[in-house]
Amino acid sequence: MVKEDEILPKYWYNIIPDLPKPLPPPRDPQGAYFSRIDLLRSILPKEVLRQQFTIERYIKIPEEVRDRYLSIGRPTPLFRAKRLEEYLKTPARIYFKYEGATPTGSHKINTAIPQAYFAKEEGIEHVVTETGAGQWGTAVALAASMYNMKSTIFMVKVSYEQKPMRRSIMQLYGANVYASPTNLTEYGRKILETNPQHPGSLGIAMSEAIEYALKNEFRYLVGSVLDVVLLHQSVIGQETITQLDLLGEDADILIGCVGGGSNFGGFTYPFIGNKKGKRYIAVSSAEIPKFSKGEYKYDFPDSAGLLPLVKMITLGKDYVPPPIYAGGLRYHGVAPTLSLLTKEGIVEWREYNEREIFEAAKIFIENQGIVPAPESAHAIRAVVDEAIEARKNNERKVIVFNLSGHGLLDLSNYESMMKRLNGNG
């Protein structure tokens, strides 16, 4: 019997040394009156900043953080989706890594815990962040409470209104939660003056959180896109490799959804670095067509342009995403490392619309009994398509996907979408 402690890795994995070409470095905009790179030193915990710029392949996980990981249910389970296989009549074997098993219901806690730990080690008492659908905000709220810190969360307005239970759980963990754009920041007030009914976006909420942290000398915790986040999330893929080895399986296809890229990177990068798996498929929203219509160029990760420019696939920092149910995918860009891997042809991409992903989610729910987050349902749609393709070609492939979170706090969204699918809405 293998112990949980033996499956949970002792090191985070950093893909940067194993990329096919050097990652274009962050930079300041030409003629800038202040350095965005220097700004990071004012808002990020020191160890988080160090890990953001490291080129070491492996970073030791502090024992305190490993203990916290074990306490929240890591390693998370790897399940075989046998009933889904039977429903699709596919010879493929389908497995999913279930990050919804954590207390906060998603993968986000994997980086919230170490970032909060490093902040507390510095004597920080208050942390700030943004959240889209609420998964990241929930993770930060819990991690902050673990280390007796206060937290402030700027939640994208459309999700704040669509997902009141997400808001409630953050408040239960002790967080102050605000609908972004707000009147608390100069940038938020500027947006509201232009459009008082602005639905908000992750880029705007990120800008507000950074400004608020700077103004109050708090620390900002980052939820996606930056390299340090994908580093921490590598526990997902490393656990999955070990769990597949224990089953005697080798993955052929690895699939995950993409908002900024943290769950996909955390899941697939250990496979890519170890040359395991043959195909890697990143799945995003057709309503926010960053892969099909985005440009690979230097752009700001946040809408106000407070963070350094990074080279990534982007729809532009001023892009306003439509108010889709998968709030965690409402982001204009793709993590720089994932952007590079996509441009180099190592990672494939897919984009699906809401109807397509909710149809796939319904099939998954009926057969596996787990309600996926709308974001994760994008990955499920790609899994269904790949399984059907395997059936057509009679290929006994092993398909593994990351089910990044549960949708039990998104049931009102499911109800609305089911009415539309049934022609009643």
UniProtKB/Swiss-Prot annotation:
The keyword Nucleotidyltransferase does not apply. GO terms for molecular function: L-serine hydro-lyase (adding indole, L-tryptophan-forming) activity; pyridoxal phosphate binding; tryptophan synthase activity. Its EC number is 4.2.1.20. It comes from the Archaea. The modification N6-(pyridoxal phosphate)lysine is found at K108. It catalyses: (1S,2R)-1-C-(indol-3-yl)glycerol 3-phosphate + L-serine = D-glyceraldehyde 3-phosphate + L-tryptophan + H2O. Its cofactor is pyridoxal 5'-phosphate. Tetramer of two alpha and two beta chains. The beta subunit is responsible for the synthesis of L-tryptophan from indole and L-serine. Belongs to the TrpB family. HAMAP family: Trp_synth_beta. This is Tryptophan synthase beta chain 1. It comes from Saccharolobus solfataricus (strain ATCC 35092 / DSM 1617 / JCM 11322 / P2) (Sulfolobus solfataricus). The gene is trpB1.
